[in-house]
């Protein structure tokens, strides 16, 4: 019996190009003004985005790389097993990620499985993403409230300075979440203007770090919520190393804080 050959639809090169450009432009135009812009598509940013989008908030993630997930793909030392301390495994259960309790309160999962599930969950919830888009600056309004971000294409930063006359563009939002990890890039732009003081992250101390990072996740400045390792940098908290429970729970807490801020603005 001869196998029937697949016959693809008749589509030309111009049709493909128009589809890419048209749909990108349509989506980008919608998200030039968002409820929440999240800078950084690592585990805490993705978690915050998933929670907010699931509540119906227009949520846009800005990611400088051409991939999402940050360090969530690899648990540490180039090994792709990641650890989560209880109660963080409850998020893995929510996402449908298999994990094993290897000692009391310490769970291990496959990094690629966990990361891909989180990315899919964020996308399924309705989060939209601008990849290869680098954060450049903040937008401020009355009272120095953060009201958006200034962005550019990531490859622009690699161009020789003498030919890099490529102005960035601005995106507006009601709330911005800094999920840029240890760099705390959004918070540091406020610091450059004397509007916020960051301390810098401390040395590794897993047991102290995770509790403190979730506890301190919140609004660091009007319109700006910090989550994940950016919290450590802003408040001088210990780093946690290759364990991810606090990243996930910090993202959830950031979403609650942002949602409360949006509700207050609506009033």
Predicted regions and their residues:
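Feature captures the FAD/FMN-dependent oxidoreductase FAD-binding
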Residues: 96-176, 185
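Short hydrophobic core segments
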Residues: 37-39, 62, 169-181
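Glycine-rich FAD pyrophosphate-binding loop
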Residues: 37, 53-73
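Short FAD-binding loop at a beta-strand-to-alpha-helix junction that anchors the flavin cofactor
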Residues: 218-239
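Glycine-rich Rossmann-fold phosphate-binding loop(s) that bind the pyrophosphate
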Residues: 40-44
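Extreme N-terminal leader/targeting segments of oxidoreductases
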Residues: 1-36, 153-156, 202-206, 211, ...
């Amino acid at each position: 019996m001869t196998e029937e050959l697949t016959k693809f639809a008749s589509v030309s090169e111009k049709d493909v190009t128009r589809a890419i450009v048209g749909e990108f432009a349509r989506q980008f135009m919608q998200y030039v003004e968002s409820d929440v812009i999240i800078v950084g598509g690592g585990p805490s940013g993705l978690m915050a985005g998933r929670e907010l989008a699931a509540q119906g908030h227009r949520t846009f993630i800005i990611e400088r790389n051409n991939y999402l997930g940050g360090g969530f793909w690899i648990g540490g030392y180039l090994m792709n097993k990641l650890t989560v301390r209880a109660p963080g495994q409850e998020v893995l259960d929510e996402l449908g990620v298999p994990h094993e309790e290897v000692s009391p309160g310490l769970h291990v999962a496959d990094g690629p499985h966990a990361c891909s599930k989180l990315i899919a969950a964020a996308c399924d919830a309705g989060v939209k993403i601008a990849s290869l888009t680098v954060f450049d600056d903040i937008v401020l309004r009355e009272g120095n409230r953060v009201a958006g971000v200034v962005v550019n294409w990531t490859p622009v930063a690699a161009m020789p300075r003498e030919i890099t006359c490529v102005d960035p563009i601005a995106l507006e939002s009601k709330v911005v979440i800094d999920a840029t990890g240890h760099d705390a890039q959004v918070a540091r732009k406020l610091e450059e203007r004397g509007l916020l003081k960051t301390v810098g992250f401390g040395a590794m101390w897993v047991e102290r770090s995770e509790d403190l990072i979730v506890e301190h996740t919140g609004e660091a400045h009007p319109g700006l919520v910090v989550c994940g390792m950016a919290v450590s940098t802003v408040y001088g908290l210990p780093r946690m190393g290759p364990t991810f429970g606090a990243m996930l729970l910090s993202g959830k807490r950031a979403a609650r804080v942002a949602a409360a801020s949006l509700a207050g603005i609506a009033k």
